[in-house]
Amino acid sequence: MFITFTENVIELQEWSTKKELIYSLSQCDLGSILLNEEDDYEQKFYAAIVRPQTSGLHYFGIGICSEGHGLKPNLLINPELDMIMFGYNKEVVGVNLKNRQIAFRIKLNSLFYYFLPLKNQGIVLIVQEVDITAITELGKEIWRYGKDIITQTTIEGEKLYLNFMDESPACLNILNGELVRV
């Protein structure tokens, strides 16, 4: 599968073994980054191969060693910043495509589920198994909230409604993470 944004084409790949992933990344003449390579429980292997359209047939690769858990890594593209955020295992990593470097890394308290980008507020909500973390588009943490296993998220204006498995629902202000009375 290919994704095109700004001056880049991204090919998403899945590999059966770490050896295959490393070989694929070794073919990237513009360099590569391997995320979570030190994990002892890696089970699944993914890559995003980036080809800047202005540089001909040259490639930059980002590989992910995932623990499996039944959750595939997610990526969130921010064309204005030329950045890709990767969410996997218990981590979110932002990669700057201009300088091909890790821009930020955020450790999570529980398994990553998905991103909720809020462009108008310049905020990205990171939904995890039992937490929500709000960050800026540049990766600066704004707030965290955790209570129980999250079963549903709903956004209305500047309010984030959360349903939990065994706890009562909560409503948070998206901008500061404070509880809001409903």
Where are these regions (language model features)?
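A short beta-strand motif characteristic of beta-propeller blades
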Residues: 57-67, 101-107, 139-146, 178-181
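Short polybasic amphipathic segments
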Residues: 44-55, 133, 160
